Each structure stands twice: as structure tokens, then as C-alpha cells.
UniProtKB/Swiss-Prot annotation:
Alphabetically ordered keywords of this record: Cytoplasm, Lipopolysaccharide biosynthesis, Transferase
Similarity remark: Belongs to the KdsA family.
GO BP of this protein: keto-3-deoxy-D-manno-octulosonic acid biosynthetic process
Molecular function via GO: 3-deoxy-8-phosphooctulonate synthase activity
One GO CC term on file: cytosol
Protein name (Swiss-Prot/TrEMBL): 2-dehydro-3-deoxyphosphooctonate aldolase
Coiled-coil region: none
Amino acid sequence: MDIKINDITLGNNSPFVLFGGINVLESLDSTLQTCAHYVEVTRKLGIPYIFKASFDKANRSSIHSYRGVGLEEGLKIFEKVKAEFGIPVITDVHEPHQCQPVAEVCDVIQLPAFLARQTDLVVAMAKTGNVVNIKKPQFLSPSQMKNIVEKFHEAGNGKLILCERGSSFGYDNLVVDMLGFGVMKQTCGNLPVIFDVTHSLQTRDAGSAASGGRRAQALDLALAGMATRLAGLFLESHPDPKLAKCDGPSALPLHLLEDFLIRIKALDDLIKSQPILTIE
């Protein structure tokens, strides 16, 4: 099943789409700088591109952690991104009242993993009519995503994307089950499945409020996931990850973006040049 996002076709058998940007909006200047580099690289490589950032990180572990610029300022920044670069934008919402204002600016709205079973939020998102990206909760099996998909269908919206972002593996660790990509496709009507590689690299030190990460393994994990024939890759970068206000240890250094994507595109092109082989 393919989904249209403006002039972009998103489907498991179509060339992969990059959902990329920064974890959280820090300022207008840094946002435009990061987005400009993404646009330059993706246009050079011929990769369809959707800009990603959060206006509010409402689920930070510490009340003292940076959350973002807020809804009002965030929407202004997204409007400037769209006006300057002419690209679609995706951002996440956390409360039902945010859904309609965000949907009026952003092309895709995202359901956070921790909130994916919140029915009131699901219904409010569905009613916007926008394309919705559903983050798979760390605590759910891939097949359980079907229940969330059915909620959206009952609320009148079938324009859905499914996003893997890792599964809890004991305490303070995430792993990615490569078989889960196929399970989500099979149980959810072959909806587009994308892979959030940077959040899947998160770790946490016992007792720490801040997430750690394993960015050195980002390419290995991304290639493994994309080899399963996915619709897209979800990737966060930062000009200087050490200075990032959220999830810096998992962020790809921005200057490595082109070399990273060259390898991802080469694999995606190879995988999708071959016919699907069904093994019963």
C-alpha cells in the first residue's frame, strides 16, 4: 500500500524516503542550517526528503531537561522551513488539542511511542485527515501494532505509516528485531514501514536522567533494517552532537550525512531492483 505525501510516494516497494532532521527545535538559525544541508544532500542523491523536528519533548526524564521552543514558535519555524525549502514537514503531538493546529502546518503528524495506545489522542489525530506516523512502542510486539491501526481506521483515517524504534531488552537497553518489520507489514495490510535508527541506538546509564547512545553503530543498524525492504528511514543529525540539547549521543554528525546516505541508497536500490521472493 502506497501513501502520497505531497509529490512523494511512500511505499515498501518504492525508493526509500528520508525522514530526517533534528531531535528538537533549538533555534530558527540552527534549524535552517540543518535543513539546508539535508536538502542539499538529498537533492544531490535523488532521495525524497521530509524534514523532521519536535517542537516539544514532553516526555523528558527530568523536569529540568530542555523541551523545545513550544507549539506556537515551533509552527512558525516549520512554516519558514516549508516556505524556504518547499519540502514536507513531520512533527509529533502529545495532546489532542495540538493535533489540528499542527495538521494545518505540517504534512505528517507523529504519534509518539509512549502515547500510541492513548485513544483520545489517536482519534484527534485521525480526525485531522493528515498522514500519521505511528511510532511502535518499545513495550509492544510488532503484531500488536494492528490494534493501533484499527483504532485509526475506526476513527476514519487509513493514511498511516508504521515506525520501528527498538524494543526494550531488559533494563536500560533497546534492540531491533529484524523479523518485526515483516510482521508489521503482514499484520497491518502492508502499510509503509519506516525505521527510526537513531532512537533505536539509545541506551541509559542506571540512575541517569539523560539518554546515552551508540551512534558509532548507526550505519550497521540502518543497513540491516533497510535490507528488509522498507519504505523509509528516520534519521536525526546535529551539527555538533556534543552540544545537542536532546539525544546527542545517538545523533549522526551532520557532516557525515552524505557518506551515510550514499551507502543507504545503494543498498535500497539493490534490494528493490529484485522481485519480491515469497517463501511459504
